[in-house]
A protein has these predicted regions:
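Short secondary-structure boundary elements
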Residues: 1-137, 141-149, 420
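Helix-coil-helix junctions within alpha-helical repeat/solenoid scaffolds
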Residues: 43, 163, 188-190, 229, ...
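Start-of-helix signal in alpha-solenoid helical-repeat scaffolds, especially tetratricopeptide repeats
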Residues: 79, 83, 96-103, 116, ...
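TPR-repeat structural position
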Residues: 79, 112, 129-132, 178, ...
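Structural motif corresponding to the intra-repeat A-B loop/turn of tetratricopeptide repeats
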Residues: 109, 129, 173-175, 195, ...
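Short coil/turn linking the two alpha-helices of tandem helical-hairpin repeats
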Residues: 110, 123, 150, 167-175, ...
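Internal alpha-solenoid helical repeat scaffolds
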Residues: 140-339
């Protein structure tokens, strides 16, 4: 019976009757009395018997019994049994289905290189299933095992593969700006310089780009995207040649190059082929077309096409859900919320952020819920809950800052400043505006610079600094027009038109505002166009009285 206990503890979780019989035969010769022996172990309360669909399975009642039995075997004998279990017992389909089981037995058998292959398979398999913590554990197990190898070029090549694999689930679970991701990105960047022709080089460069973009090194992220693109062209890598458009488009959007960004992102959407590109989730940690549609939504809103913007992010969410990739779903929910936030649709913001928070309570969603919390706070404010909404919005912004997130922050901080101005908390608003400007100068994220200039104009006007106010309103219009950001230009024109009316020029303000409002073909029921039409009516009335 002791031999059967030992055999069983080697099998571990792989405990159906057939496997136990085969291993028992391997361990101590043919075992015609296996049924009797196992039965005696069950009667002795050492094993627990369970009936499955096709056969019975067995497990130890107490881990201590298993451990004692395992340690009672000679180390070399244990090693041989682990190896023979992989070679002779576990069927091939099971090896593909549960690679971590094979990896464990090969590790215990001392077959490091073979084990690494299966730990890597297990990591990627878990990552594809959005089991991020499990994937992290598998990749880290492999990295621990790699340390047993001699320090040479092959070891560095193997480590690069595992570090690159680890990056995706780390980003999905902790966000691009976490210390863990920062460390892995630094290590993979270092290794990639020493490993020639590494197949992981593109996922390494992509992760570095994502870190730079999210943490607020926008121009550096653009250079990283260009480096990725150039390498893809030199190597003729079709997958990377496709993925580059998502990267270039996102960086250009943040730089305020909206039309160039639109063209890049349009390529990422139109060139997508499911059979070729859906599998890129494994290398890049997100569905590329989903991400492209998300950023396209932001670009289109800025350019003055709010209905098209909402259509793009809605399609992104539908695609992410059809794929079933958690991180892609989280991203799409955030961008659905963001476009609704920019459109000032409080109900939609609340619905999308609540769905995101519910998903985040079950699975990690990186930094998306942190940013979502700030938008959730604004939705409460828009519905009249000042006491609950304002602290929640501040909390979301502060949490994002503490996490090292800079991208998207101008949308949130300028909205907060606008609210504070409306509450006559001028000093608080001035502080937020100054912080927003400093952040924008540091990161290079310029796609909402026009809104910042508009708010500086509103602040100066409130403070009685009329020349400065007019200069800021004009600067806002100049930036918005240069970027072709019609949504921002509309908001700046509303403010400037009101300012002109207050300074005795309502007809001039009315003409400017009527011109920009007439340009829009989408979003007629949106907050900003409704506000513009009301302002035009008021300005016409004032002009008649002059």
């Amino acid at each position: 019976a002791a031999g059967r206990v030992a055999a069983h503890c080697i099998v571990g979780a792989y405990t159906d009757r057939a496997a136990l019989a085969e291993l028992a035969a391997l361990a101590s010769g043919l075992a015609p009395d296996l049924e009797k022996s196992v039965g005696s172990l069950v009667q002795s309360d050492l094993l627990l018997e369970s009936s499955g669909e096709q056969d019975k399975t067995y497990s130890f009642r107490h881990a201590l019994v298993r451990d004692v039995a395992y340690e009672s075997m000679l180390r070399e004998h244990r090693r041989q049994l682990h190896e023979r279990l992989v070679r002779d017992v576990i069927p091939d389909d099971e090896k593909q289905r549960v690679p971590e089981l094979v990896a464990h037995h090969l590790t215990e058998a001392g077959l490091v290189v073979e084990a690494l292959n299966y730990w890597k398979q297990a990591g990627y398999r878990a990552s594809r299933a959005s089991a991020h913590y499990e994937a992290i554990a598998h990749f880290q197990r492999g990295l621990t095992l790699i340390r047993e190898l001699a320090e040479d070029a092959e070891r560095e090549r193997l480590e690069l593969g595992f570090q690159a694999g680890l990056t995706g689930p780390l980003i999905a679970s902790t966000g691009y700006t976490s210390e863990a991701v920062k460390a892995v990105v630094a290590r993979t960047s270092e290794l990639s310089k020493r490993v020639d022709n590494a197949p992981e080089i593109f996922s390494v460069l992509y992760s570095r780009w994502g870190f730079l973009l999210t943490s607020g090194s926008i121009f550096e992220s653009y250079n990283a995207a260009r480096e990725f693109s150039s390498l893809a062209e030199r190597q003729g890598n079709k997958d990377a040649l496709y993925a580059r458009y998502r990267m270039l488009g996102a960086s250009r959007m943040c730089l305020g190059e909206l039309e160039a960004a639109r063209l890049d992102l349009e390529q990422a959407v139109s060139l997508y082929r499911k059979e070729e590109h859906e599998g890129l989730i494994t290398a890049y940690g997100v569905a590329i077309r989903v991400a492209a549609r998300c950023f396209m939504g932001e670009v289109l809103w800025l350019k003055g096409f709010p209905d098209s913007a909402r259509g793009n992010v809605t399609l992104a969410l539908e695609e992410a859900k059809s794929i079933g990739h958690t991180h892609s779903i989280g991203m799409a929910l955030y961008f659905c919320g963001l476009v609704s936030f920019l459109y000032r649709d409080a109900n939609a913001v609340r619905e999308y952020t609540e769905e995101m928070m519910n998903l985040a309570s079950r699975q990690p969603l990186a930094a998306w819920p942190t940013l979502g919390k700030a938008m959730q706070g604004w939705a409460q404010l828009a519905e009249g809950d000042l006491d609950g909404g304002l602290p929640l919005m501040r909390q979301g912004i502060d949490s994002a800052k503490k996490a090292g997130i800079s991208m998207f922050m101008p949308f949130l901080t300028t909205r907060l400043a606008e609210i504070l101005l409306s509450l006559d908390r001028v000093d608080d608003a001035e502080s937020i505006i100054a912080d927003s400007e400093a952040l924008m100068d540091r990161t290079g994220e310029r796609n909402y610079e026009g809104e910042l200039r508009r708010l500086k104009g509103e602040l100066s006007w409130r403070q009685g600094l009329f020349e400065e106010a007019e200069a800021q309103f004009c600067a806002a219009l100049e930036v918005a027009r240069k970027q072709e950001a019609k949504a921002v230009e509309l908001r700046a024109t509303i403010s400037y038109a009101r300012f002109l009316a207050a300074r005795g020029q309502p007809d001039r303000g009315c003409a400017m505002l009527s011109s920009i409002a007439a340009w829009f073909e989408e979003g007629k029921d949106g907050h900003d166009l409704v506000t513009a039409e009301a302002a035009i009516a008021a300005l016409k009335g004032e002009a008649r009285q002059v």
